[in-house]
Regions:
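Residues within the DNA-recognition helix of helix-turn-helix
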Residues: 28, 35
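Alpha-helical residues within the helix-turn-helix
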Residues: 23-24, 41, 62
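Short helix-boundary/capping micro-motifs
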Residues: 11-26
Length: 84
């Protein structure tokens, strides 16, 4: 499990789709799906209920989502500080 996978999970949740998160990161939908699946396996918990048209957070996903959002913002702040 990598911090960037948690950030990617946060983006999927925020954007509501694998496709939009893939476009944001210049990667394919299948890469997003694979990384989220690997994150779920590492945590031994399903994070998302997936259908062909929608995503919904599981209870474990809800718990991770709030922490993941903080991690995403802290990471972005660190990057911005370095660039300044």
């Amino acid at each position: 499990m990598h911090a960037n996978d948690i950030v990617l999970f946060s983006q999927v949740v925020e954007l509501g789709s694998f496709k939009k998160a893939a476009e944001l990161n210049n990667i394919t939908n299948s890469v997003v799906s694979k990384r989220i699946t690997q994150l779920e396996q590492a945590l031994n918990a399903q994070l998302l209920y997936r259908t062909t048209r929608s995503l919904a957070l599981t209870e474990a996903g809800k718990k991770l989502a709030s922490s993941a959002d903080m991690i995403k913002h802290i990471t972005q702040e660190a990057i911005d500080d370095i660039k300044d």
